[in-house]
Amino acid sequence: MARIRLCYVTHGLSSNGIESLLVSIAQQIDREKYDVTFVLALDPDVIPVHEETVLALGMRVIHVCDLDGLAKKRRYASSLRRIFAKEQFDVVHANMDLLNGIVLRAAKKAGVPRRICHSHNSKTQYAVGKGAVLKKLAQRAYRFVMRRLILRNSTDLLGCSELANAYMYGRRPATVIHNGTQLQKFSDARKTGDIAPDLRRAPVHLCTVGRVSAQKNPLFLVDVIAELSKLRQDFVLHWAGTGELYDAVEARVEANALQPYVQLLGMRTDVPQILAGCSYFLLPSLFEGLGIVLIEAQASGLTCFASDAVPEAADVGACRFLPLEIGAKGWAKAVDDAIRSGTHPEVDPARLRLYDIRNTVEELDRVYENRGEKA
């Protein structure tokens, strides 16, 4: 029997949550059953740290242009149509947020029988600053058009949470796929004491991991650390990630003389080892589709603090949700209280197992197997 020709469409295979998920899926999927290709829109600031991983698995990678500007988006759509027509995929699985509309339209025109939209987020980050009103109107128009294209051209609607599904599909029925991770890597690092050697020493270790972007609310996190440093001085926050607000974070850390309390680690591929050396995790995001890094942190034994904009589905027993409205002082007090108590909530093994990458692959396999069959 011929293998199912499966195509993942995404940005460059960087270390962010969505692309790390796709790499984990690639490592677990049945390669005798699936012939896998990645089509990547490699943005200039993306470092494709995982590309060699999928190539080593015998999978193909096809690069198309970046998406900087309208002309390149048109070129991107044209390239997709050519690729899909040539390759004759059985399944196209789009992971490009609202741009999935363009991807799925190209797939339908090329006759791809199964066209999957996967929603990984729960909100659009609207423009701020000069010209924000006009930019926001343009973004809303773009979202309206892309959602129509998605709904008209997809056969399957997937999302990482009910919140992510509502954002992308409105009231249309959609399936929740538990965006999993390789849980064993995280629990094993903790059990064996496999800790990143460059973590700065301190009695109390906090951590955050993720792209340093507006969505993650990083400047608020700096303010939380500033307030926490007034309550106690025995901690350090290990901060893994890079992004467009990295320089602004670094500047605010310096302006508040927080260098003793914040260790900026930049982009890292040893997240299990970083988490293994920490006890508390902070994620004050403005919005999240799920927040898979929270699952990883809880699998590593950390007590987590997340904003109440993060879906409750990310809580597998060791997560406390805090409103952003209580401010940096309120967050700092909550973290300080937890440290003083010395207790850590227990993870629910049954809920955690839902986010094992093997379960994710099983859920997706049921979708992929129905090739050619209208969802």
Regions found by a protein language model. Give the residues of each.
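N-terminal strand-loop element at the rim of the active site
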Residues: 3, 8-75, 244-246, 367
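A conserved mid-protein helix/loop that constitutes part of the nucleotide-sugar donor-binding site
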Residues: 16-24, 204, 208-227, 244-250
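Donor nucleotide-sugar binding/catalytic pocket of nucleotide-sugar-dependent glycosyltransferases
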Residues: 62, 144-191
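Acidic anion/phosphate-binding donor-loop and adjacent secondary structure
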Residues: 68-75, 166-171, 178-202, 370-371
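Nucleotide-activated donor-binding/catalytic signature segment of Leloir-type glycosyltransferases, i.e.
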Residues: 249-266
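Aromatic "clamp/platform" in nucleotide-sugar-dependent glycosyltransferases that forms part
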Residues: 267, 286
